[in-house]
Amino acid sequence: MKEEKEHRPKEKRVTLLTPAGATGSGGGTSGDSSKGEDKQDRNKEKKEALSKVVIRRLPPTLTKEQLQEHLQPMPEHDYFEFFSNDTSLYPHMYARAYINFKNQEDIILFRDRFDGYVFLDNKGQEYPAIVEFAPFQKAAKKKTKKRDTKVGTIDDDPEYRKFLESYATDNEKMTSTPETLLEEIEAKNRELIAKKTTPLLSFLKNKQRMREEKREERRRREIERKRQREEERRKWKEEEKRKRKDIEKLKKIDRIPERDKLKDEPKIKVHRFLLQAVNQKNLLKKPEKGDEKELDKREKAKKLDKENLSDERASGQSCTLPKRSDSELKDEKPKRPEDESGRDYREREREYERDQERILRERERLKRQEEERRRQKERYEKEKTFKRKEEEMKKEKDTLRDKGKKAESTESIGSSEKTEKKEEVVKRDRIRNKDRPAMQLYQPGARSRNRLCPPDDSTKSGDSAAERKQESGISHRKEGGEE
């Protein structure tokens, strides 16, 4: 790579620096250009020479001073930077150091000395170091800090002078009483609180205010509704009282002509009976032309009498009742909405009564359902117990039948048992429970009889026992068949 870099610019420079018509001077210029290129190549080689070294894999607890002690004696260098461990790179928490040497020979000696050198930490763990060229060969420049022009000029600053003046006045105020100071502090706090207004706080305050206004409106409406209801009830009651009074007055007025009528009632009754009898006779008879005209005249006269009576009653009522003034009539006209409010109140009462009736019906229906469920449960339990009893009866019958069958089987085995009993009587051994047959009947005093009686009598007794068993089995069968 170095040879290519050396040859390429030479060829270019030669072609460019050969002007036409200048032969002798061209040789001198070519020699100067070759010298300049050699200097540039040397500078490039110096720049390309690696001088910055990094020491990696150092213990995480190692400090800069401890590392410098280990590296003594240090060769000539112009840059030394130490970086402690980084906890974010766990578990690879190692320290490292960068050194820029002035001489290339010192780099080789340093590498031979510290590459693979084992460092120990506080806990005695070993950390073999690695020495190699740094990937970034440039060194950080040390910035020369310029002196600030404002250093030592605070006494001349006008703001500082104002501060000193205000500070002196504050000291004078401190001599005042604590009450005045508290008042001043409270006033300042109030001003600060009043000034602290953000859009969020204003929004929340407005929201709270709107809620309070809505609540007040609701309360006011409820109060008005209650007042209106009370007024409607009061008016309705007053109207009812007034109507009752009017009805009572009318009844009193009607009673006066009724008393007068009571005196003439017997005559009227006689006339009525006579009229009924005459009417019946007339109905039986065929009406003639003259009679029909007379009947029409009588009916017309009756109608006129009835109309006259109704007019007299109306006139009597109007005379008896006091005349109302125009103001009262005007007051009565706007009473229509009051009547409507009374009707609404009555309708509400009717709806409430209907709701109560519906609730009572639902409760009765639920009670009936519960009673039906309880009855069904009782029926189910009764049926269950009845079925259980039937099953028990069937089981008892089956057991009785099984006993009868087993008795028959014992009769067939009886002959074989006779021979065994004879041998047992001869031996006169005690019979144990395990040696007894499964279906042998209990015979009290059988052992004493066997000892006293000869073997022939024992056989007879065995035959009689077998006959008894047969008879008992037959009787059981008969009972089972009858059942």
UniProtKB/Swiss-Prot annotation:
Chain positions covered by the region annotation Necessary for interaction with RBM8A and for activating NMD: 430-447
Span list, region Disordered: 1-51, 206-483
Outcome of mutating residue 52 to E: Abolishes interaction with UPF2
GO-annotated cellular components: centriolar satellite; cytoplasm; cytosol; exon-exon junction complex; neuronal cell body; nucleolus; nucleoplasm; nucleus
GO biological process assignments: brain development; mRNA transport; neuron projection development; nuclear-transcribed mRNA catabolic process, nonsense-mediated decay; positive regulation of mRNA cis splicing, via spliceosome; positive regulation of neuron differentiation; positive regulation of translation
Hydrolase keyword on record: no
Stored InterPro entries: Nucleotide-bd_a/b_plait_sf, RBD_domain_sf, Upf3, UPF3_dom, UPF3B_RRM-like
Annotated tissue distribution: Expressed in testis, uterus, prostate, heart, muscle, brain, spinal cord and placenta.
Residues that bear Phosphothreonine: 169, 198
Residue numbers spanned by region Necessary for interaction with UPF2: 30-255
SUPFAM superfamilies the UniProt entry points to: RNA-binding domain, RBD
GO molecular function: mRNA binding; RNA binding
Residue span of region Binds to UPF2: 52-57
Compositionally biased tracts (Basic and acidic residues): 1-14, 34-50, 209-268, 285-314, 323-409, 417-437, 457-483
Pfam families: Smg4_UPF3
Keyword Nucleus tagged: yes
Keyword annotations of the record: Cytoplasm, Disease variant, Intellectual disability, Methylation, mRNA transport, Nonsense-mediated mRNA decay, Nucleus, Phosphoprotein, RNA-binding, Transport
Location within or outside the cell: Nucleus; Cytoplasm
Family: Belongs to the RENT3 family.
Assembly, per entry: Found in a post-splicing messenger ribonucleoprotein (mRNP) complex. Core component of the mRNA splicing-dependent exon junction complex (EJC); the core complex contains CASC3, EIF4A3, MAGOH or MAGOHB, and RBM8A. The EJC core components EIF4A3 and the MAGOH-RBM8A dimer form a composite binding site for UPF3B which overlaps with the EJC binding site for WIBG. Interacts with EST1A, UPF2 and RBM8A. Interacts with CPSF6. Interacts with DHX34; the interaction is RNA-independent.
Clinical note on disease: Intellectual developmental disorder, X-linked, syndromic 14: A disorder characterized by significantly below average general intellectual functioning associated with impairments in adaptive behavior and manifested during the developmental period. MRXS14 patients manifest intellectual disability associated with other variable signs such as autistic features, slender build, poor musculature, long, thin face, high-arched palate, high nasal bridge, and pectus deformities.
The protein's role, per its UniProt record: Involved in nonsense-mediated decay (NMD) of mRNAs containing premature stop codons by associating with the nuclear exon junction complex (EJC) and serving as link between the EJC core and NMD machinery. Recruits UPF2 at the cytoplasmic side of the nuclear envelope and the subsequent formation of an UPF1-UPF2-UPF3 surveillance complex (including UPF1 bound to release factors at the stalled ribosome) is believed to activate NMD. In cooperation with UPF2 stimulates both ATPase and RNA helicase activities of UPF1. Binds spliced mRNA upstream of exon-exon junctions.
Protein's name according to its UniProt entry: Regulator of nonsense transcripts 3B
Lineage per the UniProt record: Eukaryota, Metazoa, Chordata, Craniata, Vertebrata
